[in-house]
Amino acid sequence: MGRDICTLDNVYANNLGMLTKLAHVTVPNLYQDAFFSALFAEDSLVAKNKKPSSKKDVHFTQMAYYSEIPVGGLVAKLVPKKQNELSLKGIQIEFLGVLPNYRHKSIGSKLLKFAEDKCSECHQHNVFVYLPAVDDLTKQWFIAHGFEQVGETVNNFIKGVNGDEQDAILLKKHIS
């Protein structure tokens, strides 16, 4: 039996640059480099003998490889309790992207399944994502994977790299 052509692996400090590049290619002008470098900021503070903050977010990160070529990535965050009226409790997908030439090969579905599995492991019941309101293609992909829109459009919720603000929608999927 052959091995799977699409595999997932953890993101480490040494391949974080690849995840950052994938994000810039798949969703241009949305993520700053600081967003990704913050994923490993606590590790670098400990290495420099500085005191890490006591409040640490729990992130789950994965890289998707197609025939050993990095083609996609996922950054998800555990939200153990509701922060405000615009948030939910569960696993928030902060970034899920696959290079255009590798879409429709179930790579995104594998990354989403990883987030759903983490949701169950953490005893949570919701996977949710904020999307730009104008991104109908991504919205339809999430809806096809069992997500539904929650509430109305949130004005000026997403801030891009250039400082421009976009309206957002919240999509969620309930995990039993």
From Swiss-Prot:
In the UniProt record, does the keyword Cell wall biogenesis/degradation occur?
no
> What Pfam families does UniProt report for this protein, alphabetically?
Acetyltransf_1
Q: Name one GO molecular function term.
A: protein N-terminal-methionine acetyltransferase activity
What's its EC?
2.3.1.258
Ordered alphabetically, the record's keywords are: Acyltransferase, Cytoplasm, Transferase
Q: Where in the cell is it found?
A: Cytoplasm
The N-acetyltransferase domain sits at 14-176
Which CDD domains does UniProt cross-reference here?
Answer: NAT_SF
Q: Which reaction does it catalyse?
A: N-terminal L-methionyl-L-alanyl-[protein] + acetyl-CoA = N-terminal N(alpha)-acetyl-L-methionyl-L-alanyl-[protein] + CoA + H(+); N-terminal L-methionyl-L-seryl-[protein] + acetyl-CoA = N-terminal N(alpha)-acetyl-L-methionyl-L-seryl-[protein] + CoA + H(+); N-terminal L-methionyl-L-valyl-[protein] + acetyl-CoA = N-terminal N(alpha)-acetyl-L-methionyl-L-valyl-[protein] + CoA + H(+); N-terminal L-methionyl-L-threonyl-[protein] + acetyl-CoA = N-terminal N(alpha)-acetyl-L-methionyl-L-threonyl-[protein] + CoA + H(+)
Q: What does this protein do?
A: N-alpha-acetyltransferase that acetylates the N-terminus of proteins that retain their initiating methionine. Has a broad substrate specificity: able to acetylate the initiator methionine of most peptides. Non-essential component of the NatA N-terminal acetyltransferase.
Additional free-text comment from the UniProt record: Present with 2370 molecules/cell in log phase SD medium.
Recorded protein name is N-alpha-acetyltransferase NAT5
Upper taxonomic lineage: Eukaryota, Fungi, Dikarya, Ascomycota, Saccharomycotina
Q: Which gene encodes it?
A: NAT5
